Amino acid sequence: MWINYLVLVAVLLVGTTALAKRLRRLWAFIYGPLLLLSCISGDWLLRNLEFEDLVTATEASEAPLHRWNREIHQIFDRGVDSYSAPAGLEEMRQTARERHRNLLVATNDVEQVRVAPWHFSITRAQQSYERHGQAWSEHLGEWTAFVGPDLPTADGEIKASFDIAENDFLDALTLFPRFDLRSRVEDIFSERVLRLVTP
């Protein structure tokens, strides 16, 4: 009787071992694609989060430039006699100083955005916007020392760097962007015509 019992146990052990091997193979077959899918989806989410941080910082950096354009055009609208007078010149210099300070703080926030080393397109977008911010910083620096009579003209580097940044930002968008990123990027770069100060 006990011999039959030992045979039954042996058969069960052999069967269990074979079943375990089959289950391990099946698990490896399922686990590989699941692991790959989780890596891809995790990286997609990380890219969206990083790019959302960059777009938010860029929006904040654009704000002082839009404000500068509004303020300087308000001064121009008063007429040449107004902005060529000493008080008008000082008002323009002071406005430029304030916006320049705002821009430096906002540009620093753009530089501080953390990007994974393998997300090259986001890094490229970040660097191209930093160059654009530097071009604007130099331009506003000219306005802070403006004494007349010729107005500082917007350097062509501002427009060129803005166009490059636009292309890089569009390239950095993920396949299915989250956080309304596509429309936010389009909004940032939709006002290029209004940016250059031409009285």
Predicted regions span which residues?
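Transmembrane signal-anchor/signal-peptide helices with a preference for the extracytoplasmic
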Residues: S38-A57
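Short, solvent-exposed, charged loop/turn and helix-capping segments
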Residues: E98-E130, G148, L175-D187
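Membrane-interface helix-boundary motifs at transmembrane edges
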Residues: L19-W27
